[in-house]
């Protein structure tokens, strides 16, 4: 029978299968396709048995089974695989049909695909999908962007299958071009930051001699207050987990992997000139963890401080760690939203920052109560330049900064690496400093490269000084540093 499916989904790895089952559960007829056709038959005979899901044995067969305008979602590996499928789909589709890329594609690729397909009359959507396998099955956070004309066509499906927070769907149109995938990239970068901050809190507690159960209890307490979040919750569960050999966490090799989206966020921050320092440190911390053999060798020859980790009042210091984690988390999100704001300005995206915070409230890895406070901040002040300037977050840091400073200072004294906690504190202090030592930096640049400088009160007028009396008076035009 032709024209019976509401949407087709290409790619039957776990995420693809679970999204199909989610759509089916919400009443949509889905056509499943995979490059390896045997996988389609296997899926229909097992996971999709007794559902309305139908299969296709070729792209032509798949397209013939779709209602018009046709909607095809790709959940395949980012990069050339997406372009290959698009190339094969183009001759089979008609003007007004929609192709959706639900993978972790680079936002520049999504922008390019939008431009290319617009010339052919096809609508393209690049959608971030967050929440992992469980989210895909029971309600992910969805961040669609691209050709806005596609939104009314996919909105009923996307808002039916997504997670809900306080009854509102964790899915809304993000913006043109690569906006959806850019927001998903920043989400993943913030996820890197959150995880690193939690790891540093764990490292400090472990150095103080807390047992796995004691640390789990502490994370459990934090999860019932302002740090209530998915990542804090699973950290508690991981710490408590035992198998036949005891606590599993202690036997896991301390080398962290990464798929690249955190790195993309750090690169984008450099490209847009936004100091997203915490996410950068989170990425570099994973790189450092990968140097396991070198670290083991260095640990036996490089000396640290003689001071051991100990405090007079453990209960109070554990509370200090909680406040430090919360304050640094505020900075991480402030930096992420700074990056989105600058990218939106340069790409002429109309991003709804409160809406983005709501999209992240449910279904995704960084879901937390905290995001509700961010939504409130941008709802009351849509043009807010930085979350740190919002009254709620300003007061939170005022309450917690003494604890934050105490934790970072002690970690330094004890030789415990806290790159994320400390870079967040440095950013906070830099952001609140009216006059930074960049005047000296600019003078140095002018000294060796004749790069000129502005004088206070004479902004826009550039001066060069012959610092040695032997150089010239001409400013530089090519040499940059």
From Swiss-Prot:
Record-linked SMART domains: 6PGD (SM01350)
Active-site residue numbers: 184, 191
The protein's enzyme class: oxidoreductase
UniProt-annotated binding residues for NADP(+): 11-16, 34-36, 76-78, 104
One GO biological process term: glucose homeostasis
Signal sequence region: none
UniProt EC number: 1.1.1.44
Keyword field contains Disulfide bond: no
Catalysed reactions, semicolon-separated: 6-phospho-D-gluconate + NADP(+) = D-ribulose 5-phosphate + CO2 + NADPH
Binding annotation for substrate: 104, 130-132, 187-188, 192, 259, 286, 445, 451
InterPro entries membership: 6-PGluconate_DH-like_C_sf, 6PGD_dom2, 6PGDH_C, 6PGDH_Gnd/GntZ, 6PGDH_NADP-bd, 6PGdom_BS, NAD(P)-bd_dom_sf, Pgluconate_DH
Secreted recorded as keyword: no
Pathway: Carbohydrate degradation; pentose phosphate pathway; D-ribulose 5-phosphate from D-glucose 6-phosphate (oxidative stage): step 3/3
Gene Ontology MF term list: NADP binding; phosphogluconate dehydrogenase (decarboxylating) activity
Key words of the record: Gluconate utilization, NADP, Oxidoreductase, Pentose shunt
Protein role: Catalyzes the oxidative decarboxylation of 6-phosphogluconate to ribulose 5-phosphate and CO(2), with concomitant reduction of NADP to NADPH.
Subunit details: Homodimer.
Family: Belongs to the 6-phosphogluconate dehydrogenase family.
UniProt protein name: 6-phosphogluconate dehydrogenase, decarboxylating
Species for this entry: Drosophila melanogaster
Lineage: Eukaryota, Metazoa, Ecdysozoa, Arthropoda, Hexapoda
């Amino acid at each position: 029978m032709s024209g019976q499916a509401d949407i087709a989904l290409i790619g039957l790895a776990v995420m693809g299968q679970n999204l199909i089952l989610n759509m089916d559960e919400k009443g949509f007829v889905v056509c499943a396709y995979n490059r390896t056709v045997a996988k389609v038959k296997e899926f229909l005979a097992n996971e999709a048995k007794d559902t309305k899901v139908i299969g296709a044995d070729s792209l032509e067969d798949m397209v013939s089974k779709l209602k018009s305008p046709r909607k095809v979602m790709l959940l395949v590996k980012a990069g050339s695989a997406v372009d290959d499928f698009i190339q094969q789909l183009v001759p089979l589709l008609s003007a007004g049909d929609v192709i959706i890329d639900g993978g972790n594609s680079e936002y520049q690729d999504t922008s390019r695909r939008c431009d290319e397909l617009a010339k052919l009359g096809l609508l393209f959507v690049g959608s971030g999908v967050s929440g992992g396998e469980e989210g895909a099955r029971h309600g992910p956070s969805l961040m669609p962007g691209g050709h806005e004309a596609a939104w009314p066509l996919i909105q009923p499906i996307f808002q039916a299958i997504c997670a809900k927070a306080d009854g509102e769907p964790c899915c809304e149109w993000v913006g043109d071009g690569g906006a959806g995938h850019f927001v998903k990239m920043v989400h993943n970068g913030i996820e890197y930051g959150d995880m690193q901050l939690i790891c540093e809190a764990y490292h400090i507690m472990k150095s103080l001699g807390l047992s796995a159960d004691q640390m789990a209890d502490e994370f459990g307490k934090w999860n019932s207050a302002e740090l209530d979040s998915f990542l804090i919750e699973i950290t508690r569960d991981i710490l408590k987990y035992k198998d036949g050999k005891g606590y599993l966490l202690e036997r896991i090799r301390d080398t962290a992997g990464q798929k690249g989206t955190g790195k993309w966020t750090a690169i984008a921050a450099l490209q847009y000139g936004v100091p997203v320092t915490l996410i950068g440190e989170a990425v570099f911390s994973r790189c450092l963890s990968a140097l396991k053999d070198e670290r083991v060798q260095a640990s036996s020859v490089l000396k640290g401080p003689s001071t051991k980790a100990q405090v007079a009042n453990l209960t109070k210091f554990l509370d200090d760690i909680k406040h430090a984690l919360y304050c640094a988390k505020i900075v991480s999100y402030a930096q992420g939203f700074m990056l989105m704001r600058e990218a939106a300005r340069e790409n002429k995206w109309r991003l709804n920052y409160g809406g983005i915070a709501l999209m992240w409230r449910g279904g995704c890895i960084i879901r937390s109560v905290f995001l509700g406070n961010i939504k409130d901040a941008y709802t009351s002040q849509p043009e807010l330049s930085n979350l740190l300037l919002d009254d709620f977050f300003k007061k939170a840091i005022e309450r917690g900064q003494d604890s934050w400073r105490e934790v970072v200072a002690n970690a330094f004294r004890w030789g415990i690496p806290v790159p994320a906690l400390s870079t967040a504190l440095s950013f906070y202090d830099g952001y609140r400093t009216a006059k930074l030592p960049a005047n000296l930096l600019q003078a140095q640049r002018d000294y060796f490269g004749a790069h000129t400088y502005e004088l206070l009160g004479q902004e826009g007028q550039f001066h060069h000084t012959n610092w040695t009396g032997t150089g010239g008076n001409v400013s530089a035009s090519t040499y940059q540093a």
